[in-house]
């Protein structure tokens, strides 16, 4: 996998993990935005994998859902390994984005 595809995949998996932790905490996007200090618009873009999140913002989100960064990275790593089984829609989204980018 080349670096661009890996970056797209990672952004999508991070977004899915944030969304999953948000749902596990039983809070909505607005509540997570308030708890973390991240705008709702930015949160939507992060959760959908549209942007590469910076470490400071990611840390704010992770702490807001009651996790520590090492725990979060373990979750991300596990999901990267299992993505094909657990996140087929992410795999499709990544494939679609790669196809679109290759047409440009």
Q: Language model features by range: what are they?
A:
Residues 54-71:
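DNA major-groove recognition helix of helix-turn-helix/homeodomain DNA-binding modules
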Residues 31, 42, 52, 71:
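Residues in the helix-turn-helix
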Residues 21, 35, 46, 75:
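Residues in the recognition helix of alpha-helical DNA-binding motifs
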Residues 16-33, 60, 88-89, 93-96:
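Short basic helix-loop element that most often maps to the first helix and adjoining turn
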Residues 36-51:
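Recognition helix of helix-turn-helix/homeodomain-like DNA-binding domains
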């Amino acid at each position: 996998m080349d670096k661009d595809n890996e970056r797209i995949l990672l952004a999508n998996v991070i977004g899915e993990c944030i969304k999953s932790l948000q749902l596990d905490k039983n809070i909505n996007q607005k509540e997570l935005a308030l708890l973390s200090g991240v705008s709702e618009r930015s949160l939507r873009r992060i959760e959908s994998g549209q942007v590469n999140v910076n470490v400071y913002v990611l840390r704010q989100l992770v702490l807001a859902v009651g996790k520590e960064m090492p725990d979060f990275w373990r979750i991300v790593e596990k999901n990267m390994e299992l993505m094909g089984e657990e996140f087929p829609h992410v795999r499709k989204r990544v494939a679609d984005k790669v196809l679109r980018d290759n047409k440009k």
